[in-house]
Amino acid sequence: MKPNYSVNTAPKRSDEPIWWGLFGAGGTWFAMITPITVLVLGILVPLGVIDAEAMSYERVSEFATSIIGALFIIGTLALPMWHAMHRVHHGMHDLKFHTGVVGKIACYAFAGLISALAVVFIFMI
């Protein structure tokens, strides 16, 4: 018995898995890490729950120049930007702004620029 479907032996490769991976990583970071960062830096330290000395310039600078700190700062800046730009790109399509490849390149180039700037700024510290 012959199956009623055909298998494409030369499928077209897509770049979507790369963008979906960055989108998912950015969304996860933004949902799980960013609220804790805002809680600690924006609420607990100003209220005095966490000692202000823990956030002194020397300690924060030391953290930012360590590999873990640098990766944390880059992740905090870059990953949510990839998530947001992926949403903007697909949101434009949903709103019938069919920008095609130009819109895709503009969105992802902007996210790439922010990611590159995050890396550059880490090396400037």
UniProtKB/Swiss-Prot annotation:
Keywords: Cell inner membrane, Cell membrane, Membrane, Transmembrane, Transmembrane helix. It is found in: Cell inner membrane. It comes from the Bacteria. GO terms for biological process: fumarate metabolic process. Pfam families: Fumarate_red_D. Part of an enzyme complex containing four subunits: a flavoprotein (FrdA), an iron-sulfur protein (FrdB), and two hydrophobic anchor proteins (FrdC and FrdD). Anchors the catalytic components of the fumarate reductase complex to the cell membrane, binds quinones. This is Fumarate reductase subunit D. The lineage of its organism: Bacteria, Pseudomonadati, Pseudomonadota, Gammaproteobacteria, Vibrionales.
